[in-house]
């Protein structure tokens, strides 16, 4: 079970990773131009996360489970980063 300190460490790491991903995505792709574009980008990232969720970890070896967990973390960071980009780029 995660302690409050563990959760705080995870939050700090995630926020740093989100910041890095926002910076990388803006440099690579430029700003989002509309809510429709933002929705499609967020949905694409969410679908990539969902693909990992649907994998039965009991059918994976240890290496596969580790890769799945890492992939889910990456996708969650990307989802959060695209939400931040939407707040930055699109007038709501």
Predicted regions and their residues:
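Flexible "arm" and connector segments at domain edges
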Residues: 1-92
């Amino acid at each position: 079970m995660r302690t409050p300190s563990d959760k705080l460490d995870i939050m700090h790491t995630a926020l740093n990773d989100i910041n890095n991903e926002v910076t990388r995505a803006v440099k690579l792709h430029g700003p989002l131009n509309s809510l429709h574009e933002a929705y499609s980008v967020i949905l694409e990232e969410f679908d990539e996360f969902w693909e990992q969720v649907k994998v039965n970890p009991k059918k994976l070896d240890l290496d596969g489970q580790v890769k799945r967990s890492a992939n889910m973390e990456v996708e969650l960071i990307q989802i959060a980063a695209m939400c931040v980009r939407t707040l930055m780029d699109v007038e709501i």
